[in-house]
Structure formats: C-alpha cells, structure tokens
UniProtKB/Swiss-Prot annotation:
GO molecular function: ATP binding; CTP synthase activity; glutaminase activity; identical protein binding; metal ion binding
PROSITE patterns: GATASE_TYPE_1
UniProt lineage: Bacteria, Pseudomonadati, Pseudomonadota, Alphaproteobacteria, Hyphomicrobiales
Binding site for L-glutamine: 353, 381-384, 404, 469
One BP annotation, GO: 'de novo' CTP biosynthetic process
Provenance organism: Agrobacterium fabrum (strain C58 / ATCC 33970) (Agrobacterium tumefaciens (strain C58))
Assembly behavior: Homotetramer.
InterPro entries: Class_I_gatase-like, CTP_synthase, CTP_synthase_N, GATASE, GATase1_CTP_Synthase, P-loop_NTPase
Protein name: CTP synthase
Keyword match Thylakoid: no
Binding of ATP, residues: 14-19, 71
PANTHER family associated with the record: CTP SYNTHASE (PTHR11550), CTP SYNTHASE-RELATED (PTHR11550:SF0)
Pathway annotation from the record: Pyrimidine metabolism; CTP biosynthesis via de novo pathway; CTP from UDP: step 2/2
Amino acid sequence: MARYVFITGGVVSSLGKGIAAAALGALLQSRGYRVRLRKLDPYLNVDPGTMSPTQHGEVFVTDDGAETDLDLGHYERFTGRSATKTDNITTGRIYKNIIDKERRGDYLGATVQVIPHVTNEIKDFVTEGNDDYDFVICEIGGTVGDIEAMPFMEAIRQLGNDLPRGTAIYVHLTLMPYIPAAGELKTKPTQHSVKELQALGIHPDILLVRADREIPEAERRKLSLFCNVRPSAVIQALDVANIYDVPIAYHNEGLDSEVLAAFGIEPAPKPRLEQWEEVCNRIRTPEGEVTIAIVGKYTGLKDAYKSLIEALHHGGFANRVKVKLEWIESEVFEKEDPTPYLEKVNGILVPGGFGERGSEGKIMAAQFARERNVPYFGICFGMQMAVVEAARHLAGIENASSTEFGPTAEPVVGLMTEWVKGNELEKRSTKGDLGGTMRLGAYKAALKKDTKIAEIYGTTDISERHRHRYEVNVDYKDRLEECGLVFSGMSPDGVLPETVEYPDHPWFIGVQYHPELKSRPLDPHPLFASFVEAAVEQSRLV
C-alpha cells in the first residue's frame, strides 16, 4: 500500500518545493523504496503549453507527450523515473474534466460544486495508479492562502481522513528570514503560515525551514512549540551552492529519517548515497572550465531553459569540468557584430524557441560557429536556423526561410501537416488550435551509420522527446547534402529530418528533438557529454 507525502509551501513562493520533493524522492529511493512524484498546479490553464516561457518558465515534455510543469524535470533528474501525463494536473484540466462529465450527464442531474465534485476529482487524480509504489510525494503548487489553491488544500485535507490511518503526512516548506537590523532570524512568518494551514484543517507533521544561515536550537524549539510539531521534525533547509547538494544536505539534517519515523517505519533501511556523493565531489573539484554561449530569446528568465542548463552541467560532470554559461539575447546580433560576443567562447548552443523575433541572430550564431570551427549545438529551432543558414550561404538559396515567419518562396522550414504517432496518422493545419497540437513526446529516429551522432549514441536506433510544430523541409535535403550538410538522422519512415551535421567540422550537430529532457546528473545525456568534451578541446586551442 502506498504512503502519501503532501508538500505545501508558505510565506513566499519560489522556496523550492519542487527541489525538496525531488530530493526527498531521491533519498527514499536510496533506501530501496519505489517512489512516485506528482504535482498539483492551481492555475486555470489546461497545461502550460501555451503559456509564455518568460512567465511560467520551461515546459517539460514527458515521453507520452504531456506538456507539464518544470518541476517534473526536477523529479526525473533526481529520481531517474520518467514522469507521465498522469503526474501533473492543473485547475484548468480538473474543471475541463468536470464540465465534460456534466455535459455527458455523468452527474445524473446533481448540482456540480467545488465540494464534493472538484475535490473528488483531485483526490481521484492523487490516488489512482499507485499500487506499484511505496511512496507518493505530492507537491501542491503556490502558497498557503492563495485563493487558487483552496480546492487542492481541501482535497488533501480530506485525503488525510480518507486514507488508512498512518498512510499520509504533511510537510510544510517555509521561510525563516534574517533581519539585518535586528541581527536575528525571525520565526513569526513561519508561525503565521502554519496557523493559516491549520485553519484549513491541515496540521503539518514536518516543518522544512529555508534559511540562509544556521537556525539556533532555541529558535527550533520555539517553532516546535508554537507550530505544534516535534522538535526533531523542525528541519533546517539551508542554502547550498548547487541543487545536487540538496539530497545529502537534507539527509544530514534528518529529513528522510523523520519522514519514515512519521510513518512508523523504524528501523529504516540504510541509504546508499555513493552516487550522489560522487556527483557532489565532481561539482566541488572540477579539473577545468569551459564557456558555452547560449544564444536564445527568453534569456530574461533562466527558468525558460531549466533542463538545458542542467543538461550542460551534467555534460560538465561527465568531463570533470565546470561549465560557465554566457547568456546572449539573439536579437543583439541583428544590430551588432557577433564576433566580440562569440570569439572567446568554447561552444555555441542555440536552443528551441518560437516566432520570428531573434531568428536572424540565431542564424548568424550558426554561421559564426560553422565558419570559425566552434562547436555548435542546435536544438529544435536551433537546428532549423542552422539549416536555413546552410541554405542561404552554402546552397545559394538567398530567400531561404521558415513559413513560421510568413509566406516565403523558399520554405526550407515548414509546418508539419502530418506525421505518424504509434500506428495512427496525426494531422494539423494552420487554422488549428495552439494548445496540445504540436508533435509532442517520444518518437524514434534512425541514425545514419558512420556519422558523428551515431558514434556518440553508440547505436543507430534512438528515441527522443519532441515539442515542435515546424520541421525542416525534406525536399531540400539533396541540395543541402551536396553542400556538405549531412542529414544524419531521419524519422523511421524517412519523411521528417531529425538530425544534421557537418562531417568536416570539429562538432556541429543540430537535432529536432530536445535531448536535455532526458539528461540526468547520474546519467548525463551522451550528446551533452560529447558537446562539452568538444568545448574542452576547443578551449585548448583558444
């Protein structure tokens, strides 16, 4: 029977509930338990797929094609377990499900209300499909007191009574700010946050208290007294230098032991943390440093590239080097010469994106990398712009462009109108909805033998996650290959280009998919490990 850990947040947002949930999952896994992580998001969007990256951050795509919250990326990276569409739900999805049921007549004429219909829908989501797991860690988005989160708080309160006794606990993540004028940490914000949580009928079993310095024992006892939790259940969550330090830091503070004790699991199995210790050691003792330029269009919010950032660091772990990121807004190159920005970097990465803004700057970045023999990694839109650059400057197709930007005489990149998903044919048109209509999730690709990318993977059959609406036009394949750009990977039916590369370049690879979504600190993605390795070689030439 699964046990449930509900993680809530208080005082302020962005305290790191996702990291806390992921770290706890990793710690329980290290003790031999089977763990599942789920996220409840209070916003009214059906999913984050159509939300601005500068508001929401990255959209994390699962193997089964769900567009989800970026916290699911943390869950996957810390536990190694691939998430699914059933691991993330929003208020919008819940209400959509309920309205669909009401229209079908499933409620038999009943008045549909928040209680019980909305709360029941939430409870069903939380509890379904958990027979194969020992623990289900469920993160509730937002902050206690948010009006959007009220149905979720009520649902998890009810679950505390619905589930068998001793199978559900509540962990409250809160903040203990330091006031310089007073020279001390303050407990009052946490007290008020817990008071508000208790007013909703939820009594936390464990307090996970964020702070930027050691919490004195007297303050811990004070929190224990006023918040009605055991002294040992007041766990300090101090700031750390790297997120991959968090599992061991929380273990040293006793979080996983306290969770198991709250469930009455004593004595608990010993944790095996050797792999995490090795990762932390590589982070602390790098043998070198490389600089990677990320030429993007959402650089104002780094969370828009969360998985990408982590995957680059994983590549650094694999090569025992520190990866320094140089963020460049691609529009800058449309006004200024890119040379001063790029001549000292060891690698250039152009990530995914949407729309015409900044596209010419990305094309210029690809041209610089090709002509100067700088390692180049183009992902999704970054591959498309590299192909447009080749079409213009190598194949002589001056008007080469993408139909995403408007009508063009040379549609080197165009809207995908159909593709095979499983055994079915998916179709799209320019007049279709935006939400959930891209080529989403894991698709297989066939790599050409004796290419660099096949050598990197060590196989010619791969499966990677996609999120795109436009694709390189296969009709231009022969003309581009005559100019030296090799289409080194295609969809199994040979219709959709998946990867391109220049054989005579030190490292120039474009991929239509998003390999960053499958990279793990304990298992770096081979493309990122190889890209950083190429950057290390480049650093020796500069």
